[in-house]
Amino acid sequence: MKKQRKILWRKGIHLAFSEKWNTGFGGFKKFYFHQHLCILKAKLGRPITRNRQLRHFQGGKKALQIQKTWVKDEPPCAKTKFSVDTPHASTLSSPVKRKDTKHFVSSSRTLLRLQAEKLLSSAKNSDHEYCREKNLLKTVTDFPSNSALGQANGHRPRTDPQASDFPMKFNGESQSPGESGAIVITLSNHKRKGFCYGCCRGPEHHRNGGPLIPKQFQLNRHRRIKLSPLMMYEKLSMIRFRYRILRSQHFRTKSKVCKLRKAQRSWVQKVTGDHQETLRENGEGGSGSPFPSPEPKDPSCRQQPYFPDMDSNAVVKGTNSHVPDGHTKGSPFLGKELSLDEAFPDQQNGSATHAWDQSSCASPKWECTELIHDIPLPEHHSNTMFVSETEKEIATLGQENRTSSLSDDGVKLSVSGADTSVSSVDGPVSQKAVHSENSYQMEEDGSLKQNILSSELLDHPYCKSPLEAPLVCSGLKLENQVGGGKDSQKASPVDDEQLSVCLSGFLDEVMKKYGSLVPLSEKEVLGRLKDVFNEDFSNRKPFINREITNYRARHQKCNFRIFYNKHMLDMDDLATLDGQNWLNDQVINMYGELIMDAVPDKVHFFNSFFHRQLVTKGYNGVKRWTKKVDLFKKSLLLIPIHLEVHWSLITVTLSNRIISFYDSQGIHFKFCVENIRKYLLTEAREKNRPEFLQGWQTAVTKCIPQQKNDSDCGVFVLQYCKCLALEQPFQFSQEDMPRVRKRIYKELCECRLMD
């Protein structure tokens, strides 16, 4: 352990001396404290005889100061070399020699110091040069200790700066009085990582004629920084924090994804880029070679395509050249991927004619194949065949007697009965031909960049992605693909006035029968109008809805009541069935009466106040409620339970003596079931039915439809009762509640159950 500490101690000393870790930051304020202590004691003139390590620092103090003042090699512009006397070198290096220190000053650095001194001594012949250099040296030495020059590179300020403490280099060392120049002072760090902090301007130009340019501040960012554990640097935590972020898996994954996205080009960029490369290859391949010549890297050296003006047809060998049948298989153009060359026009008398491959069909015909040698090429004629290829698919477009005229403004392609703009698979092409001295030159950077993404070209199928491209190869028409389309519907012979009168009469009938438009559905309105006019009015729903809204505004209040047996419902009771309202006791009780009357011999429906009366007053409070009814002759008893804000249902199956609990929220109130069981036992003793005094069981039904809101519990209870009474399965859910509400409204108004 002691040996390990000693090794770390020495590493810390070496790191503090070398200052590698200080590159790129400001002056370090806190570094190895022993070194700081030694230098401070040395400046104060106090002897340091603490221990062996401190003596080592005392001996290396001067070496550290000299090491901080190392300079770069002489710049290339320095022409003069000086000879050095050995006595001076020995005198300079003698103060540095100590017992426990190393020689940090080499002969080359001593030579540089002597060169600066000899430069000053040789300049005394010229008063102008001497004064200028003396003033410059004075300016450098008089810099304050906290200036940018003294603080640069992390050097600590010195107490007594002298001219000898600043290693300097001078560009333009020996000049005659008549010559002019500029002096560059270079203050360099150790290991020849020099930095030029300024240029002391003399005249405008150097004596050799070249302009004087100050050196730029350069920092090797790829240089690794090895940190010692004994180092106390105030920015170390920030370095570690940023390093952890950069090395995190999320950051690296995100950066990789961003690089991949940047590297991938969009489909339009690929199209335009491939076409620009094609234009360059076509322009350079005019020498008759089947393969395009390599493109120069310098864009200024690119040759523009040249079109010869000849009375005869100009045939250029390429992918679109005319090859007789039988020679296609031996074509040198077969490969994995071929580039599309623009069809060269046949030029006659200063005009060019673009024509397509003539075929028997009048409409454009697309033939898709996988290999190029499977496409039959027509014989050579005056027209030019247009061949387009994308990887393994080759399409041949033929059009009969279609020409395009080439003028000074551009190339216009007109095709009747087809798209007005025609482009190749590799991308849209916009050309501008300029006629000058029997030649046509194509401007690549001008019109191509301006019109390459025009609206007309982007509308073309080949400017869209492959997923959005129409199915042209299969010959399918895109017109009226979905159901013939509603756009082709004929104008309705029924005007708005007739429709409004018929609709108003139908709404009057609904209001008279139900007291409101709550049970009315859209399907019923459209069905009624179709029966009257024998026409579908689905396309006129906005007008119908507007008429219904106006009708409701005119008939807001209606004196409507329903009487059934001992029950009476007014509009306030029926309004609970509208929207998300809670059902009240009147609606529950009257609907239970309808269920009981639908199957009078099997089902008995208790009033919603029965359970509350039983809990508050006991059996004597409800004894008279079943005075005229023998409960034990029924098959099913339906008992609604209303607990403040929630509706539940208890059923009693007398055949097997089972008491069941139904709740649309999955709640089980055991005390309610126990109260009903005690009531049945008491009722059996009162009616002298000993067979029902024992064998009762309770059950909780869970696999039933559940509500998904807080307002439809009463509707679920009524639907449970109806399905159990009519022995129907539970085939409803929360989505059916609006329809169930309308149906219950109608059943209450018509005083009968509907299937």
From Swiss-Prot:
Residues 269-329 are annotated as: Disordered. GO terms for cellular component: nucleolus. GO terms for biological process: cell division; protein desumoylation; proteolysis. The keyword Nucleotide-binding does not apply. Residues 272-283 have a biased composition (Basic and acidic residues). It is found in: Nucleus, Nucleolus. It holds the Pfam family Peptidase_C48. Residues 563-724 are annotated as: Protease. Its EC number is 3.4.22.-. Keywords: Cell cycle, Cell division, Hydrolase, Nucleus, Protease, Thiol protease, Ubl conjugation pathway. The active site is at H646, D663, C713. This is Sentrin-specific protease 5. It comes from Macaca fascicularis (Crab-eating macaque). The gene is SENP5.
